[in-house]
Amino acid sequence: MNERTQRERDRSTGGYPPREALADAWDEHSRYVGFAAGLFAIGILIGIALMAAGYNLLEIIEEMVGEPLFPDIGGQSRTELARFLLVNNTRAFLLSILGALTLGLLTAWAMVFNGIIVGNLGAFIASNDGIGFILVGLLPHGIFELPALFIAAGVGFRLLYRVGQRLRGSRDAILTKRYFYRTGLLVLVGWLLLVVAAVVEAFVTPALLEALFAA
């Protein structure tokens, strides 16, 4: 009996262990998570292209709104920085899910826009400090933060698709207890990745940059 068949049998007999529910949630959402990652990648390419054309988006946005896109966090302790990063990223995480209420437009825009900013900023920093600096500065926390945001966006896109299925009559209900359960577990895993990302960005990334690139 393969793993999927075993999960189906467990569900039919009333059992739904968290591990199996999480596996089902990933099976259900993985395509949409991949779609979100693809939108982000497109944004990165756009951001790099804009920097290559001479457009520094951080400077442009700062001139438009009259203040920096990113607040000054230099005076914060590591713990305060981790808390700030977690709160800020949790907002983006929740907005990516709730973007389903905008027919997915907000979710899609968040993925593309964040990709553009990362690509543009990364290209700028790499041109000044080298590709090694940007890799050390982004990868340690990015390997946790980006999958978390992609999961949130994937949940938003999948929810929108379920609404479409209900409208077409191919699904009896948009939301069910099992859907809430398994998707809630996936969302929890995604948020926990944000917690790890915030800690790494606040404590590990600065130490690595100082150790490897301090003058």
Predicted regions and their residues:
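Cytosolic juxtamembrane amphipathic/interface segments immediately preceding
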Residues: 12-32, 95-96, 171-179
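Alpha-helical transmembrane segments and their helix-start/interface "positive-inside/aromatic belt" motifs
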Residues: 23-42, 180, 184-188
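Hydrophobic core segments of alpha-helical transmembrane domains in multi-pass membrane transport
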Residues: 35-49, 190, 195-198
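Interfacial/capping segments of alpha-helical transmembrane domains
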Residues: 44-71, 112
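Hydrophobic alpha-helical transmembrane segments and immediately flanking/interface helices
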Residues: 59, 106-116, 202-215
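Interfacial loop/helix-cap signal at membrane boundaries in integral membrane proteins
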Residues: 62-95, 117-118, 123-134
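Terminal transmembrane helical module of multi-pass membrane proteins
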Residues: 154-215
